[in-house]
């Protein structure tokens, strides 16, 4: 009714997927989630989190807000490089049952 975006706190997203057996799509955009703060830190990564925009209507505005707030890191590529290994061979799901 008010067209507010629905945000999902994904700090333990991998744990929830592993525990329930549902697909990431079922848990997020198919359930109406517009944005997820995808956390990998609590599942074995070092300081690696990402904002995933599932609804393109919010993409451009969010990018501008992030820049205005100063949330751009000059060496972010080193932090985000962890995600390549994290998603390879479903490592993120294999680690999830052992996360906090």
Model-assigned labels for residue ranges:
Residues 1-100:
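Conserved PLP-enzyme active-site core in the AAT-like
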């Amino acid at each position: 009714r008010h067209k507010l975006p629905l945000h999902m706190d994904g700090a333990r997203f991998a744990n929830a997927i592993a525990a329930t057996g549902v697909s990431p799509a079922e848990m997020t955009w198919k359930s109406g989630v517009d944005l997820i703060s995808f956390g990998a830190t609590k599942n074995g990564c070092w300081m690696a989190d990402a904002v995933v925009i599932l609804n393109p209507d919010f993409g451009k505005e969010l990018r501008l807000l992030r820049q205005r707030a100063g949330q751009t890191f000059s060496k972010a590529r080193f932090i985000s490089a962890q995600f390549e290994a994290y998603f390879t061979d479903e490592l993120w799901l294999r680690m999830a049952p052992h996360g906090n």
